Amino acid sequence: MRYLTAGESHGPRLTAIIEGIPAGLPLTAEDINEDLRRRQGGYGRGGRMKIESDQVVFTSGVRHGKTTGAPITMDVINKDHQKWLDIMSAEDIEDRLKSKRKITHPRPGHADLVGGIKYRFDDLRNSLERSSARETTMRVAVGAVAKRLLAELDMEIANHVVVFGGKEIDVPENLTVAEIKQRAAQSEVSIVNQEREQEIKDYIDQIKRDGDTIGGVVETVVGGVPVGXGSYVQWDRKLDARLAQAVVSINAFKGVEFGLGFEAGYRKGSQVMDEILWSKEDGYTRRTNNLGGFEGGMTNGQPIVVRGVMKPIPTLYKPLMSVDIETHEPYKATVERSDPTALPAAGMVMEAVVATVLAQEILEKFSSDNLEELKEAVAKHRDYTKNY
């Protein structure tokens, strides 16, 4: 399974093409749109979310509510594009129109300046448009397809925010994936501890009044993953490594950890390793899950627990100093639309990219042309694992 995304933030549409989804997977536009709505939600989101109401259109690969095995093409129309017809025109336009929204003041923390140097742009809008987090719309759409596939294989995934700008959220122990999903869905800030809800919302309001932004940490948990996805035989086949790449590829994500993560560096080995248990009913299990569901780069049957850290959104309403690329004079950075935080939405994107990588691994390990064969192969493997 592989995919590509295309489109600009203020262009006419966003597009994704997925190849390798088996035939026979039940799939509707609403399956995708539900996750797109979740991506646009969350406390603290701003003006763009009021303009766009993303809805996907299938243009290939799905017929009568099921995948056909052919490449799946999905489009999302950018409604805001009507205000940008000249600025984002594919055809050449008059110089006076080109300069109308030209960007020469790069924003610190964005791709603006480096992209301009790399691709030799005199208008940094070219960098801004493609590097925008608007691109994650299609990664969420691809992830929604992946999640439908995982659900057919009895795998469940959820995400929630565990740190808001330095404020850690207490997470009750032993919550199931379903419980995490339910609690986070009921929260405007995607946390599982409702007692902290108003405190976090008040904090976001204060950050907005200050013209500033905050980052934080989001966690994705996946249950029901078969044993042995990934491999230790080559570095690039380790599944946790592939997940790490996917997570830090998300806009503004700067780090990733599994299970205890960096805390493991402060503990003794006897306090980190997960003891192995066996029972006739459950087969092999672990006493703890400090390693986040991975051993040797492979899934061990425990829930996958992965966290990603997101830096504060770099677009500030009290902009930092920058330099004009034409005059080299100091200026305040360009201000585009921004939010005080996008952590709940970022969690949705992280859930999507994790689901996508897991779907890719499942299809690699249990190669099948249609859903029925895939389900049979996974069920057979689970029986083998239990009786090993």
Curated annotation (Swiss-Prot):
Pathway given for this chain reads:
Metabolic intermediate biosynthesis; chorismate biosynthesis; chorismate from D-erythrose 4-phosphate and phosphoenolpyruvate: step 7/7
- SUPFAM superfamilies from the entry? Chorismate synthase, AroC
What's the catalysed reaction? 5-O-(1-carboxyvinyl)-3-phosphoshikimate = chorismate + phosphate
Question: Which Gene Ontology MF annotations are present?
Answer: chorismate synthase activity; FMN binding
Q: Which Pfam families match?
A: Chorismate_synt
**Which positions are annotated as binding FMN?**
130-132, 251-252, 296, 311-315, 337
Query: The organism sits in which domain of life?
Result: Bacteria
Q: What class of enzyme is it?
A: lyase
Q: Name one GO cellular component term.
A: cytosol
The EC number(s) given in the record are 4.2.3.5
Q: InterPro entries per the record?
A: Chorismate_synth, Chorismate_synth_AroC_sf, Chorismate_synthase_CS
| Cofactors that this protein relies on | FMNH2
Key words of the record:
Amino-acid biosynthesis, Aromatic amino acid biosynthesis, FAD, Flavoprotein, FMN, Lyase, NADP
Q: Tell me which PROSITE patterns the record gives.
A: CHORISMATE_SYNTHASE_1, CHORISMATE_SYNTHASE_2, CHORISMATE_SYNTHASE_3
Indicate whether Disulfide bond appears among the record's keywords.
no
Cofactor binding remark: Reduced FMN (FMNH(2)).
Q: How does it assemble?
A: Homotetramer.
Q: What is this protein called?
A: Chorismate synthase
Organism field: Streptococcus pneumoniae serotype 19F (strain G54)
